[in-house]
Amino acid sequence: MKQLTPESRIYVAGHRGLVGSAILRQLQARGYQQLITRTHQELDLLDAVAVERFIREERPDYIFLAAAHVGGIMANQTYRADFIMNNLGIQQNVLTSALRNGVEGLLFLGSSCIYPRLAPQPMREDALLTSPLEYTNEPYAIAKIAGMKMCESMNLQYGTNYLSVMPTNLYGYGDNFDLVNSHVLPAMIRKLHLAGALLRSDLAALRRDVAQRPLEGLTEQSSLEEFTAELARYGITPTSLQLWGTGSALREFMWSDDLAEACITIAERVSFAELYPAGEREIRNTHINIGSGEEVSIRTLATLVAEATHYEGRIEWDSTKPDGTPRKLLDLTRLTSLGYTATTPLAVGIPQLYDWYCQQ
């Protein structure tokens, strides 16, 4: 059972994360019933023995490998060893256990940061490994490339159907809003939310926020003066918000449930042999880009988030901090050939996510 069917026993690895939770929601919406999940407390994917036992006992037919150690520019810069070691460990354990236990179908979630820093835009799948990576997230990217190559190599040697997809920047329900370790859009939402509360001297809103999402040095009992002092560490002041870089970097963003729909469509319809020309001797770049096709500058993104959060203060840019890759837009030719197109533009998704954020 190499492709996903209604009868498949499906393991969603990382079902509490941004991507995994969206895949689980969409599988349930499509009527899939044999769904297997485990929390990190129930199954540590860095524990090879535990992973082997779990897959041997549960016998899934299909695995969505959405579990990963992820974060934004600051986290990637600071915790370089963690990003490469943990991601390689998760991938090694799940993929090899799946292979040993006869799991024929799997979908591996990579990241568009696998592409070279100066790759021609929009980035085609065959841009992989053609020039140097972006330094800030190089360890994470190398780990993801290794996972993709493991899937590709297992397919070629063992006849499995382990597909790899490379999503663009994602956002959605269940996102990580940590001010240090999150990606650009959720971090921006929280910073502008806090900046707006500080601008209005809304102590109740500030306290509610840290009660729901703890922030080092602050509690539900902290005073306005304490909030002002601590939030300054993140560029948040009573009159302005400072963001990293120049704001000129161009990025593509995709609603996580749109990604999930694309992943399930691929799992249902695609076999590995369709992803390279018949008779090809050197088979590579068999992954599939997944994106929205909607590209904005980080500066424009900040404006959209400010509108959604009703922020009326100043936004300033710290050009001494890195912008990351100058432009990242995926070529979606392979995806659109499957008949899939994303349906949630940023102007709709950002307010939806902010409403969800405020309700938590």
Protein language model regions, located:
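Conserved Rossmann-fold NAD(P)-dependent oxidoreductase catalytic core, especially the SDR/UDP-sugar
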Residues: 6, 92-137, 163, 176
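SDR active-site strand-loop-helix element
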Residues: 13, 38, 63-69, 106-111, ...
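C-terminal substrate-binding subdomain of Rossmann-fold SDR/epimerase-dehydratase oxidoreductases
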Residues: 13-18, 22-30, 194-360
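Adenosine-cofactor binding site in Rossmann-like domains, unifying the SAM/SAH pocket
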Residues: 28-53
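NAD(P)H-binding glycine-rich loop region in Rossmannoid oxidoreductase-like domains
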Residues: 48-88, 100
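Active-site segment of SDR-like NAD(P)-dependent oxidoreductases
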Residues: 70-71, 112-120, 168-171
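Short-chain dehydrogenase/reductase
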Residues: 84, 88, 136-148, 178-186, ...
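Active-site Tyr-X1-5-Lys
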Residues: 135-168, 184-200, 204
